[in-house]
């Protein structure tokens, strides 16, 4: 069964497909109220909190962010303002300075522990492409290390091996991993 997860996110702003886009392509409904959140969490052990439903002011900012097409301060604030106020966080950061900033911010929040990751290839997640930074955060303490997926038995791949696309392309790739039809880099990246 494992840990329950509450992901807080949005549609794509600076890429072709965001978390909400992927879930919609998979025909997974977005929870839009606290009752649905609790029901999904109880039944599935996971729920996605679509930011505009839970932070109404974000609806007014979304068109501006979309038109800019680049990362903004909201790429930092969004993950840190999860309405579920979890005790444990796992967050990806798009740059090394942002990973450090997020880790330092979380160390001053009411949390038990957090992990902030940044792929040294510039991605906001660890991948089989190469090494990644890991910030292990506890209240008033941040520990930084660099990890290599090879140390965990995961072989290398190229960025092209993990190249995504729009929500439909990405949802097909995810389904293939879940159905064990893809035993390559996508599966390794998901691990």
Give residue spans per PLM region.
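A generic, well-ordered mixed alpha/beta core segment in the N-terminal half of proteins
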Residues: 1-40
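Glycine-rich anion-binding loops and their surrounding alpha/beta cores
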Residues: 24-31, 36-191
């Amino acid at each position: 069964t494992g840990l329950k997860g509450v992901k807080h996110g949005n549609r794509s702003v600076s890429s072709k497909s965001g978390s909400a886009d992927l879930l919609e392509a998979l025909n997974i409904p977005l929870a839009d109220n606290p009752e649905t959140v609790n029901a999904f969490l109880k039944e599935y052990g996971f729920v996605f909190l679509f930011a505009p439903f839970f932070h109404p002011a974000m609806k007014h900012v979304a068109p501006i962010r979309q038109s800019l097409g680049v990362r903004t301060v909201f790429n930092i604030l969004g993950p840190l303002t999860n309405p579920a106020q979890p005790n444990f966080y796992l967050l990806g950061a798009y740059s090394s300075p942002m990973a450090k900033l997020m880790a330092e911010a979380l160390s001053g929040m009411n949390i038990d522990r957090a992990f902030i990751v940044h792929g040294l290839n510039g991605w906001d997640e660890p991948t089989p492409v190469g090494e990644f930074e890991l910030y292990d955060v506890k209240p008033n303490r941040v520990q930084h290390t660099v990890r290599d997926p090879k140390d965990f038995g995961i072989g290398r791949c190229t960025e092209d091996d993990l190249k995504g696309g729009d929500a439909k392309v990405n949802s097909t790739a995810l389904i293939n991993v879940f159905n064990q039809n893809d035993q390559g880099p996508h599966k390794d990246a998901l691990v």
